[in-house]
């Protein structure tokens, strides 16, 4: 259940491991990859930032290798172009050192600390006091990769089906099979796998999971460089992230279509699947604001939240953030681009769950938390779930 890239990769990996299994993939939208997958930065992450030994670190690194190989084999538009993580202030150097050490522990290939002159050789318009060169980072068409995974899986088994515009309304659990009531009728299945992204908590509860945490959505807005300014960014430029927040900071990304995006910021959204600055859902807002963890998150990060909101509605403030890395950017160089929404699994104490989280409930597997770098890690997550399904469900 769920047709983003994690759901697609899981569908694909299950079908490869169990070619005789008849699998149905339900997606409530008219298109695959229509939410987080289709609105992210399009970056193949290296695994640089993640705690050694965590699910994020292990699956990102394995998943990156698999994703690049998959893209090469199936003609998915991608480019392993590398990125620089740059420090613009001396106060950022301890965090940069910490990130570099984490990268070494995670055995990220080819990373090196570089000075300001070396940064300029890679990105001539960047002003920094040094950085980290990460040659194995890249860019990819995640929508295309998602579609190809599903296409291959469907071609392997005539009995497997894709159901688009089919929203799961409720689930009745039986001793042998579950009945999935959808917007297009009822279906029976023996085993269920949920990769529902922004709706992960709601579907888990519909499946009987007693979940204390709740998903909260954060919108990220992007600007684009004008055609005349695109030469100021060669590939990928990231700031040194603040370790107190679950975001990597506003960065520059050359996309696979040649456009250059700047962003995203991170603001609480009043609609989980809302991409406009004024989008509103009464249910989503009610659920978020009646949950104690949301208020604790707000109070614990008050100044960060206020600054992000101000920047969301001020091109001038957004530009000022970008100019920390590329000082010669001007107001005329950027124009508003698209937005994305990120699902964060939030605990009652206001803490965001950082690592991937996959849980089991009877004959169900739930991907409850799959923040960045889940798209990069998707094939590894899919393999992990396929392997766990063998153990949990005794599949042969």
Set out the residue ranges of the language-model regions.
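Beta1/beta-strand and adjacent pyrophosphate-binding region of the FAD-binding site
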Residues: 1-6, 24
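Dinucleotide-binding Rossmann-like beta1-alpha1 core, especially the glycine-rich loop
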Residues: 42-118, 122, 128, 249-250, ...
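Short beta-strand to alpha-helix junction loop
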Residues: 51-62, 86-95, 132-151, 163, ...
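C-terminal catalytic lobe of FAD-dependent flavoproteins
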Residues: 297-396
């Amino acid at each position: 259940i769920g047709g983003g890239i994690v759901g697609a990769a899981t569908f694909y990996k299950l079908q490869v491991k169990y070619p005789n299994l008849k699998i149905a993939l339900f997606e409530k939208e008219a298109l695959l990859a229509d939410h987080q997958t289709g609105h992210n930065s399009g970056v193949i992450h290296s695994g640089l930032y993640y705690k050694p030994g965590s699910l994020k670190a292990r699956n990102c690194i394995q998943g990156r290798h698999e994703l690049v190989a998959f893209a090469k084999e199936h003609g998915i538009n991608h480019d392993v172009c590398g990125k620089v993580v740059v420090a613009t202030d001396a106060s950022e150097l301890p965090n940069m050192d910490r990130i570099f050490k984490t990268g070494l522990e995670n055995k990220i290939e080819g990373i090196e600390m570089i000075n300001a002159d070396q940064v300029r050789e890679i990105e001539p318009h960047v002003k920094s006091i040094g950085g980290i060169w990460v040659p194995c980072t890249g860019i990819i068409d995640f929508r295309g990769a998602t579609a190809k995974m599903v296409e291959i899986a469907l071609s392997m088994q005539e009995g497997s089906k894709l159901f688009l515009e089919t929203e799961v309304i409720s689930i009745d659990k039986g001793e042998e099979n579950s009945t999935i009531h959808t917007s297009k009728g009822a279906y029976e299945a023996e085993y269920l796998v949920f990769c529902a992204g922004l709706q992960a908590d709601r579907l888990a509860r519909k499946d009987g999971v007693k979940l204390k945490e709740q998903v909260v959505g954060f919108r990220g807005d992007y600007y684009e460089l004008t055609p005349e300014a695109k030469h100021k960014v060669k590939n990928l430029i990231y700031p040194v992230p603040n370790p107190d927040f679950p975001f990597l900071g506003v960065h520059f990304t050359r996309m696979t279509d040649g456009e250059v995006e700047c962003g995203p910021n991170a603001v609480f959204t009043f609609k989980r699947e809302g991409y406009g600055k004024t989008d509103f859902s009464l249910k989503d807002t009610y659920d978020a604001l009646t949950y104690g963890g949301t208020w604790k998150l707000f109070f614990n990060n008050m100044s960060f939240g206020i600054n992000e909101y101000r920047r969301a509605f001020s091109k001038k403030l957004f530009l000022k953030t970008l100019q920390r890395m590329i000082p010669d950017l001007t107001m005329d160089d950027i124009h508003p681009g698209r937005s994305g929404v990120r699902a964060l699994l939030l605990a009652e104490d206001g803490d965001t769950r950082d690592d991937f989280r996959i849980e089991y409930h009877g004959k169900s597997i739930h991907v409850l938390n799959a923040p960045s770098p889940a798209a990069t890690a998707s094939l590894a997550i899919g393999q992990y779930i396929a392997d766990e399904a063998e153990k949990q469900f005794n599949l042969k």
